[in-house]
């Protein structure tokens, strides 16, 4: 059986075991058109901020991280929090897995602009079954509304054991003090806490 990418037209021949696993009802000499892994990866990378699309892991941070875990990366601006989160996301994409990158301040702004229109977005994000990266949590202006939306998302994902990576300039203690104790509690229960130092190297708490 032959698979042809509908973007780059690269051809892949499936062996009998793969064919039986993925397309058991197709004839052995059939042809399917489907996006190849490389084209899928390039398409997904277009959803990332431009500066991270082709970033290189010079500090080898991935040697210390598990692409299937939830993390809370905290530290000063420029310490490598977003880079590390995106590296995990990109590795999952390379493996054919799914995941989404979300700028948290932009999400909150969209929701505040028209909550009724964007309420479904909150529900979709909190229930998304694959990895969600919530980048720059706490950078948005904190109001009771923002606290409630944040709690709804993080509480649901913690309770349902959905992989989540959160980046923030705040420590958990600061989230506890300035944002919401319930949120810091859920993050602590869901994520491995990793402090990012100024030289972009990882130090586990």
Positions of predicted regions on the chain:
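Loop/turn-to-beta-strand initiation segments
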Residues: 97-98, 128-131, 160-166
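Short glycine-rich substrate-engagement loop in P-loop NTPases that contacts/grips substrate
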Residues: 74, 93-128, 141-144
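P-loop NTPase Walker A phosphate-binding motif
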Residues: 83-96
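A short, basic N-terminal segment
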Residues: 1-63, 193-194, 198, 204-205
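Walker A/P-loop nucleotide-binding motif
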Residues: 68-86
């Amino acid at each position: 059986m032959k698979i042809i990418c509908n973007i780059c037209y690269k051809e892949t021949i499936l062996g009998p075991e793969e064919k039986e696993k993925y397309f058991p009802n197709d004839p052995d000499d059939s042809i399917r058109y489907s996006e190849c892994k490389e084209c899928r990866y390039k398409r997904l990378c277009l959803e990332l901020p431009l500066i991270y699309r082709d970033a290189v892991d010079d500090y080898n941070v991935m040697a210390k991280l598990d692409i299937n875990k939830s993390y809370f990366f905290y530290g000063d601006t420029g310490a490598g929090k977003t880079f590390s989160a995106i590296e995990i996301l990109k590795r999952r994409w390379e493996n054919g897995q799914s995941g989404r990158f979300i700028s948290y301040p932009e999400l909150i702004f969209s929701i505040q602009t028209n909550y009724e229109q964007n309420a479904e977005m909150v529900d979709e994000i909190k229930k998304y079954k694959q990895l969600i990266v919530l980048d720059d949590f706490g950078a948005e202006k904190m109001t009771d509304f923002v606290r409630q939306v944040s709690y709804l998302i993080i509480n649901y994902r913690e309770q349902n054991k959905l992989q989540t990576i959160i980046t923030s300039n705040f420590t958990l203690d600061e989230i506890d003090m300035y944002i919401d104790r319930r949120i810091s509690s859920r993050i602590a229960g869901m994520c491995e806490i990793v402090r990012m130092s100024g030289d972009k190297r990882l130090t586990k708490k």
